[in-house]
Amino acid sequence: MELSSEDNLRLNVLLRNQPLAIRIDESSMVLYGLSEKGEAKVQLNPTCRDDQYLRIVRELLSGHVLGSPGGYPVYLQRWTRMGQTRDENLEQLLLLGEPEAVIAVACATGLTDELARRAWWTAQDPDNARRMLRNPAVVKGAMGPELAQFLIEYLPFETEPEVIVESLRL
């Protein structure tokens, strides 16, 4: 199994243009790249089952970004939620199209306001917003009010009391 030639070309062009972050909409099979100029969109054309094809796409991204052809390294998945990722790799993690990599960035102690903006573009998730708001640099930056506003608007949809209290505390 391999990428279609069209997808391979488009993804390599996207990566050559040095995107700031990448996200994948798995339901519509679209890959988005964030750049200084805006957003690029690549409609994926699977040559096999969608889940297998997405794995191949992520392997290409990982091979280009980290030099790891097997996809997002398993050992990093264990470290991410503990904030044990190295700060110099945070920008690279946002190029993998992996939800767990975005969590790694959101949990990192070296998270900056700009990296928080990119991570938020990649995965607008209330848990990620709470993770990022634990970082003083994000709270003081431009993303702090945006994330806080999102959590306030999302409060009616929360069902867990602990999560509601945590959102209000932040």
Predicted regions located by residue number:
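Alpha-helical scaffold segments
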Residues: 1-170
